[in-house]
Amino acid sequence: MQDGTVANQLAGRLRLAAACLLAWMAAAAVFCVQAQPVTESSVKAAFLYKFTGFVDWPQGTFERSNDVLVIGVLGSDAVASDLEQMVAGRNVDGHPLGVRRPREGDTLRGLHVLFIAAEREARVRDLVQSTPGPVLVVTEQDAGLRLGAVLNFVNDGGKVRFTASLNAAEARGLRLSARLLAVAQSVEGHAR
């Protein structure tokens, strides 16, 4: 009878050890599978991607209906990397999305969206002026809209928001969707 008790004790210990091992494995799996934290760069990348669906470019901007819609990211490798992952294999209105990382001296021609990461005010002004035509220029500069940007990221209590300039959009031949303007923190100018 004593052998049965020892066997029962051993079986109980094995069950306890197995339960502990399973609990440890489950905890480790949860820890390893947790989603990546949301970063400011990933939020800005998501906005840049989504903006493309709420802008009408003028007739003739794209030669063919399946031309790539190119988003340029200047000055933020983190935003560019997040955006590249986000837009891989995606289309907007039949246009595949692509990301370019222009460097100092590179031409900005061929871009449909240009995000200019934090730069000195004079540099932002020069970049905006050197990007003519129907380009959705997005900045993150306090004076971004005043410098000619169409959209500008702002920090609102730790949240990324954006402001919009209807005058800058009109000057570039762009039409911003009412749905986009409805979620902007503020909208400057007026539609004609």
What kind of region is each of these model predictions?
Residues 2-21, 26-192:
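Short hydrophobic alpha-helices and adjacent helix-cap/hinge residues
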